[in-house]
Amino acid sequence: MVSTFSRKNQNYKKDDLNQPSKDGRFGKYGGQYVPETLMPALFELETAASNAWKDKLFVKELNHLLKTYVGRETPLYEAKRLTEYYKTKKAIPKIWLKREDLNHTGAHKINNALGQALLAIRMGKKRIIAETGAGQHGVATATVCARFGLKCIIYMGAEDIKRQSLNVFRMKLLGAEVKVVNSGTATLKDATSEAIRDWVSNVESTHYILGSVAGPHPFPKIVRDFHAVIGEETKKQCLESFGSLPDILLACVGGGSNAMGLFHPFVKETSVRLIGVEAAGGGVDTDKHAATITKGSVGILHGSMSLLLQDDNGQVQEAHSISAGLDYPGVGPEHSHLKDIGRAEYGSVTDQEALDSLRLVSELEGIIPALETSHAFAWLDKLCPTLEKDTHIVINCSGRGDKDVNTVASSLDI
């Protein structure tokens, strides 16, 4: 069940919404828990990013490439048949989709990969590494490396390679070297760990294009800021389409980059509800889920303090989701902070609920969403019956489902 929204749960001050702090903290979360070897690289990256955003030529080049190469701005689409499906006697949920699935490479990931590639060039780094789970960040990184002539190495868990063979081929076709990670659970967590080990060993020549709003400062801020174009466009498009800000923003959350990209320009617009949806896998009361915010506790993973799935001894537990992109036992520190202060709400849906929603959206709107995105759509089943009035809901359609066809075909009786 979804709890009825109440502003009594909000306990933040103005400064709580102006994050991170100078030392890279979102409240008590974030920070830099890394080997000394990486501290100069993190400082260099923070300085490069700060200077880049002040450089009109950098911003002009980024915006030009977002338009001509990525295909921005992406449409805000009115999902009329979904609206009809979810309307009740009390309320009509007017559902809008922010179509990040229409970006070049098929997801939101290209926004950040492009921006960080430009930063790497500014820093003189010609070797790029990245981690990937669903393969979309890997494809986006391989794409921008091909565009700029940069050497590209992608770390990917063996389990995810089985689930995402199409994206593995795409990365190789784009000229990237895909390194298989067999350690641990052979999923996104382990791929990230291997990428960090590579970076420690090759820090002088290499830039790590981290794919989510996780990791040590300044990565959560850098990734968020490159994805904020999603929310900035959404704000403008909502005013153009229906003359007001949306009532609710809805996005799936693994590490949390697509959600933060949508949420960030609205964080100080406190009339707008922000809802993130995690992967409940086989159920949050089982040991097979990735609902970090729902069930996690404070710990340190991949250089950052945040909420984690861990046992009583602080050992990181295995996450599970049918969606490779949500199959991660941590979450970005800003999400943990927004949850703590009550500015954002978080729930979870199971594998089966996500599959059912993928099929529903496909049949009603002619749009096949990614399994990750389908978790956000599935939350409509829980949210819409609670609405007391007509409500504008914007869902971040973070990626398309082409990559998931084999997984879905084996799970749905079609």
From Swiss-Prot:
Pathway: Amino-acid biosynthesis; L-tryptophan biosynthesis; L-tryptophan from chorismate: step 5/5
Top-level taxon in the UniProt lineage: Bacteria
EC number: 4.2.1.20
One GO MF term: tryptophan synthase activity
Signal peptide extent: none
InterPro entries: Trp_synth_b_CS (IPR006653), Trp_synth_beta (IPR006654), Trp_synth_beta/beta-like (IPR023026), TrpB-like_PALP (IPR001926), TrpB-like_PALP_sf (IPR036052)
Basic and acidic residues bias spans: 12-26
Reported cofactor(s): pyridoxal 5'-phosphate
GO CC annotations, alphabetized: cytoplasm
Key words, A-Z: Amino-acid biosynthesis, Aromatic amino acid biosynthesis, Lyase, Pyridoxal phosphate, Tryptophan biosynthesis
NCBIfam families, alphabetized: trpB
Entry-linked HAMAP family: Trp_synth_beta
UniProt record similarity statement: Belongs to the TrpB family.
Physiological role: The beta subunit is responsible for the synthesis of L-tryptophan from indole and L-serine.
Protein name listed in UniProt: Tryptophan synthase beta chain
Gene name in the database record: trpB
